[in-house]
């Protein structure tokens, strides 16, 4: 599950992990017995001190062939507020809101594709 989190200025929230290169949309796995929306709220809280300011909308479900042929990624779009700045920790090295015209260096190719799809600048793909 990934979340495209926008603030009131229309900026996108991205995270840079300690264990992977590049900038990503926040998100993570869904635990057994956990709903997608529960996972979304947990991940945005953990990765950015974010709270939903709008109802999350399912944008698309992608097949991700990177790890297996059974991995599906649900991408949600929502507006958020940040309760306090996110300090770096063992998982998140850096995070922040970015204007779509001024993304940080190192945004992953998949993240750039998702942002283009969300903006209506690219056709929605079926594969992550």
Each predicted region: which residue ranges?
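Conserved hydrophobic "DFG−1" position in protein kinase catalytic cores
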Residues: 5-6, 14, 78, 97
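Conserved Nudix-box catalytic region and its N-terminal flanking loop in Nudix hydrolases
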Residues: 7-47
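A short coil-to-beta-strand element that immediately follows conserved catalytic motifs
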Residues: 51-60
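Nudix hydrolase/Nudix homology domain
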Residues: 21-22, 90-128
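Active-site-adjacent beta-strand/loop module that shapes the phosphate/pyrophosphate-binding cleft
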Residues: 61-86, 96, 111-114, 119
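Conserved N-terminal beta-strand and adjoining loop/helix that marks the start
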Residues: 1-12, 61
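Short loop segments at secondary-structure junctions
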Residues: 8-10, 79-84, 100-102
């Amino acid at each position: 599950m990934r979340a495209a989190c926008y603030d009131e200025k229309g900026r996108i929230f991205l995270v840079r992990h300690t264990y992977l290169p590049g900038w990503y949309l926040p998100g993570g796995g869904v635990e057994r017995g956990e709903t997608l929306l529960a996972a979304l709220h947990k991940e945005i809280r953990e990765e950015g001190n974010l709270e939903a300011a709008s109802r999350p909308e399912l944008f698309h479900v992608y097949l991700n062939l990177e790890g297996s042929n059974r991995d599906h990624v649900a991408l949600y779009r929502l507006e958020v507020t940040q309760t306090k700045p996110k300090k770096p920790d063992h998982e998140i090295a850096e995070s922040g809101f970015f204007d779509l015209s001024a993304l940080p260096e190192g945004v992953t190719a998949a993240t750039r594709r998702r942002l283009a799809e969300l903006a209506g600048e690219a056709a929605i793909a079926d594969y992550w």
